[in-house]
Amino acid sequence: MSADTTTSPAAPVKVGQSTKRPGGPVRWVRERLIPILGSLVLLYMFLPIFVVIVFSFNLPNGRFNYQWVQFSTQAWTNLCAPGGMCDALRLSLILGVLATLGAVILGTLVAFGIARYRFRGRSASNLLVFMPMATPEVVMGSALLTWFVTLTFARGITTILIAHVMFCLSFVVVTVKARIAGLDPRLEQAAMDLYADERTTFWKVTFPLVLPGIVGASLLAFSLSFDDFIVTNFNSGSTVTFPMYVWGAAQRGTPPQINVVGSLMFLVSLAIVLVAQVVQRRRAKA
């Protein structure tokens, strides 16, 4: 007797009938909770920036720009009206550019040395690179102050610049070294197979490939230098940078021009990001 091997036909599915499984907690979290939490995080991040931009068009009655009074563009047309603000802003921009140049030049050389060469103390060098990033700014600022006082350095622009280059250097080294480590060595080998010497290979192959990492490290170093307050406060003496001016203004009254500068900084950063996205898309299409 043979067993019946025939199977019963599957039940027909009506047109329009859903074949998806019923929703559960996991599906609800994926479709509802995660987007809600993501929206709240974005709101938490960008709401202060929105408030800064809105209050840059405010005309406060008193010294503090904390309550909306009326719409005005006076702060935008008279940016340098508060005494000393534009001087502090100009000094911070100059220090940011100089600190970026110093940190990028030194950091790029250090990154190539650590990434491309094997030498005694290489592991210790990697550890030393990360130490300024892991050191609290209060500790770094006080240590630099002790060093400058011991060497009888007059605190001012020079000491601020040395301090900024020192703590920006680590971020540059880490960023550029990661870019160098991700390069394909076969590209340089192919250039040398085509009779290119080491200098030509570096400037025609290696440097263009590392350049995006150098640009990113430059932007990061400039942002860190321009925005720094703690280390600068320890080593500035009587010199006033823009973050120090903002801190002092918060004690005696915040003019709306500070909000204007913050709005301009956000718009410039946004423009840089948009330009980078456009360039990246064009390169991807090419």
Language-model features: where?
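N-terminal, non-cleaved signal-anchor transmembrane helix
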Residues: 1-90, 94, 275, 280-286
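C-terminal transmembrane helix and the adjacent membrane-cytosol boundary/short C-terminal tail
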Residues: 2-16, 22-25, 33-36, 121, ...
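Interhelical loop and adjacent transmembrane-helix boundary motif
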Residues: 4, 25-30, 61-64, 73-84, ...
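Membrane-interfacial helix termini and adjacent extracytoplasmic/periplasmic loops
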Residues: 20-24, 64-67, 73, 122, ...
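Transmembrane-helix boundary motif in ABC transporter permease subunits
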Residues: 22-27, 97-129, 142, 146, ...
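Transmembrane alpha-helices
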Residues: 36-37, 42-49, 173-177, 183-185, ...
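Hydrophobic alpha-helical transmembrane segments of multipass integral membrane proteins
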Residues: 43, 90, 94-106, 110, ...
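A structural signal for multi-pass alpha-helical bundles of membrane permease subunits
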Residues: 49-61, 141-152, 219-224, 232, ...
